[in-house]
């Protein structure tokens, strides 16, 4: 496992399973993985992951079809939504605050690193 992120009773990480890396969420009360339908896709490789305190939102950076992209997964509805970066850049690391409403993203633009703060609805 790598890129651990904790939110109250939740542990999100990137785990290797059957030769593939995938996002995994564990309920720390019982140590059991929680189903995440739609978050792990065959054509995508997770790079960084972060979970909100209530475990409902998971922010991730993944490589897909030669592009690196930022996405937000809402567990309550099972939806993975791509989040655009403005101005455009290559995301590398992500950190979601406890409320799941503010996202910090390390981004490379023209060879320079920066941190973007993104407010989420």
Where are the predicted features?
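Short coil/turn segments that connect the beta-strands within blades of beta-propeller domains
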Residues: 8-9, 54-56, 99-101
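Short loop/turn segments that connect beta-strands within beta-propeller blades
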Residues: 27-31, 74-78, 120-121
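Blade-level signature of beta-propeller repeat domains, shared across WD40, Kelch, NHL, RCC1
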Residues: 95-121
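Beta-strand-rich domains and repeat architectures in extracellular enzymes and scaffolds
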Residues: 1-16
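Beta-strand C-termini and the immediately following turn/loop, strongest in propeller blades
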Residues: 13-18, 59-65, 104-110
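Structural motif
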Residues: 20-24, 66-71, 111-118
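Surface loop/turn motifs at the tips and blade-to-blade linkers of beta-strand repeat domains
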Residues: 37-43, 84-88
């Amino acid at each position: 496992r790598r890129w651990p992120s904790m939110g109250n009773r939740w542990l999100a990480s990137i785990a290797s399973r059957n030769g593939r890396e995938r996002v995994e969420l564990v309920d720390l009360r019982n140590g059991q993985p929680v189903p995440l339908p739609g978050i792990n896709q065959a054509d995508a490789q997770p790079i960084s992951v972060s979970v909100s305190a209530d475990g409902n939102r998971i922010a991730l950076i993944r490589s897909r079809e030669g592009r690196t992209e930022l996405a937000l997964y809402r567990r309550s509805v099972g939806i993975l939504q791509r989040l655009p970066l403005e101005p455009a850049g290559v995301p590398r690391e992500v950190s979601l605050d406890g409320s799941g409403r503010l996202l910090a993203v390390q981004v490379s633009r023209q060879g320079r690193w920066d941190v973007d703060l993104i407010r989420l609805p």
